[in-house]
From Swiss-Prot:
Gene Ontology BP term (one): protoporphyrinogen IX biosynthetic process from glutamate
The protein, known as: Glutamyl-tRNA reductase
EC number: 1.2.1.70
Residues given in the record as NADP(+) binding sites: 184-189
Further remark: During catalysis, the active site Cys acts as a nucleophile attacking the alpha-carbonyl group of tRNA-bound glutamate with the formation of a thioester intermediate between enzyme and glutamate, and the concomitant release of tRNA(Glu). The thioester intermediate is finally reduced by direct hydride transfer from NADPH, to form the product GSA.
Name of the gene this protein is made from: hemA
Length: 415
């Protein structure tokens, strides 16, 4: 089995497909353990974000696709048009590019590196990684650090979090006059809330499954923020001008009916809703309602392109460095694969040496002169070491030119 990657991202699949193949954080440990113990793979790392789901494996790509479809209870023909399958060298290049932010919706964005590290940590905890994936991701982190240090690929990057505020400012003239509701209390919500807090909105509320986690985030924000439970949403939604949601829920949290009731109470005042979750937290039908402005991660593309031209110049230098690092990694791995062969070759040489030496000692014991023994020893050793290569070459003839060329290279006969 070889190193391979199977996946889809914002470039190959719409949100409606990506959300079907996303892995909830709570399910990821069991999923990666299951994959690494299946017929599809012997090693596995699963990366699942709002913009991509990728399975890095040592395994059979066709079986991995079948496992992915079975896991999500989807027919293969429904998902296969959106998937990419990568060979060994392509997988290495892709991992490097993703970690550097070169394959992101926001060119050079830094969050993806942390997400990969989290995916690797989960895989390590589940013992689903072996030598090949450990080597790949150790090198991936090293390359990402070097590229982000030596190039400007991540500079002037507009993050999804900062873009959320920019989008709200296109609808409302002053964030300071708004009530803002955050649904969820994870990393993405914390980032977005931090940007909104800098604009000093009139009120910020964090709704979460547990009140303690919501309160913890409110304390971090250090502004006029209060916690509430998800179960409170139907009663309070109408009080907010901006709603930003990003949870790990597999089902929508905010439905069309809930928003309809809130809009009636708001008496035609606009409601800006940003759904950053995959799968979606807010029902897509909400976007059909008058005065409800619903945006998803795919709608953020144009906003996050700010500063892209400057980053693209830096990306060209980063791509060159990635190519160099891919070639370096592949050479290292091929060298390691040769180690057992080298060891076996040396063992054969040692075996021949001992046999010839044993014969020489017997001849010396019988009274043969040292010169005679050394002469025979050298002839026997030459014959033993060259017998197998000579036989193989005789059988190969002109039909196997690669073998003939390889032997010529090994013995430096092609000069």
């Amino acid at each position: 089995m070889q190193l391979t990657a199977v996946g889809l991202n914002h470039q190959t699949a719409p949100l409606s497909i990506r959300e079907k193949l996303a892995f909830a954080a709570a399910c990821l440990p069991e999923a990666v353990r299951n994959l690494a113990r299946s017929n599809a793979a012997t090693e596995a790392v699963i990366l699942s974000t709002c913009n991509r789901t990728e399975l890095y494996c040592v395994g059979d790509s066709e079986e991995i696709i079948r496992w992915l479809a079975d896991y999500h209870s989807l027919p293969i023909e429904e998902i296969s048009p959106y998937l990419y399958t990568l060979g060994m060298q392509e997988t290495v290049r892709h991992a490097f590019r993703v970690a550097c932010g070169l394959d992101s919706m926001v060119l050079g964005e830094p969050q993806i590196l942390g997400q990969i590290k989290d995916a690797v940590r989960v895989a390590q905890e589940q013992e689903s990684m072996g030598k090949k994936l450990n080597a790949l991701f150790q090198k991936t982190f090293s390359v990402a650090k070097e590229i982000r240090t030596d190039t400007a690929v991540g500079e002037n990057s507009v993050s999804m979090a900062s873009a959320s505020v920019k989008l709200a400012e296109q609808i409302f003239p002053d964030i300071g006059d708004l009530n803002v509701l955050f649904i969820g209390a994870g990393e993405m919500i914390e980032l977005v809330a931090t940007y909104f807090a800098a604009k000093s909105p009139r009120l910020m509320t964090v709704a979460n499954r547990t009140l303690a986690r919501a309160q913890e985030l409110c304390d971090k924000l250090g502004v006029n923020a209060e916690p509430c439970l998800l179960s409170d949403l139907p009663a309070i939604l109408h009080e907010y001008d901006v709603v930003v949601s990003s949870t790990a829920s597999q089902l929508p949290i905010v439905g069309k009916g809930m928003v309809e009731r809130a809009l009636k109470q708001r008496q035609s005042m606009p409601l800006f809703m940003l759904d950053l979750a995959v799968p979606r937290d807010i029902e897509a039908e909400v976007g059909d309602l008058n005065d409800a402005y619903l945006y998803t991660v795919d709608d953020m593309v144009n906003i996050v392109q700010s500063g892209k031209e400057a980053r693209q110049k830096a990306a060209a230098a980063a791509e060159t460095l990635v190519s160099e690092k891919v070639a370096e990694f592949v050479r290292q791995q091929q060298g390691r694969q040769s180690v057992p062969l080298i060891r076996a070759l040396r063992d054969e040489g040692e075996k021949a040496r001992k046999q010839v030496l044993e014969n020489a000692m017997k001849q010396l014991a019988k009274g043969a002169t040292a010169e005679e023994v050394l002469e025979r020893l050298s002839i026997q050793l030459t014959n033993k070491l060259l017998h197998s290569p000579t036989q193989t070459l005789n059988k190969a003839g002109e039909e196997d030119k690669d073998l003939v060329h390889a032997v010529a290279q090994i013995y430096h006969l092609d000069k």
